[in-house]
Amino acid sequence: LCPSSYQVGQDTLSYVAAMAKVTEQINFLAAVRCGELHPPMLARTISTLDHMLKGRLTINIISSDLPGVKLSSSERYARSREVIEILKQSWTQDRIEFNGKYYQLSLSTDPVKPYQQNGGPLLYFGGYSPDGVDLCAEHCDVYLMWPETEQKLQGLMDDMTNRASDFERLVQFGLRVHVIVRETEKE
């Protein structure tokens, strides 16, 4: 997971672009806060990065507030849903035809399609609220979870599997943990 733009700071997509030239094998999980960039521009940027990385790009969908803009949890997930649907249209179709609450678009898609010809980079998503879980079940590829008890993780995985099956989809699972490695225990 690349430096996240969850807090205003380093731009994750710029960081990934810089790392593309100095790496050959590592895959990058770039956090993208939905609503920060106009979705057609975001689709083009991600497609370009995917080519630079020769398919080593994955995207972590973030549904947080934007600086100076406060939305309810359900509104943030609704905005993320619209962004994802526009990304997918941009990556797989010749036109974007979208009429949502946050975006109304009718335009040709960018000629740059992702390097990954399976619909674009894998979309990762983490969140426990019902709106977030539904969004992941319908549109994302990997459900990220935090360390929990084995029983809670199994319950989350079972719930996601059931919700995804309602959309005739399979979702993979990931566990986000932070590992601190030092020479000694004291460090």
Where are these regions (language model features)?
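Active-site-adjacent structural elements that line small-molecule/cofactor binding pockets in enzymes
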Residues: 1-187
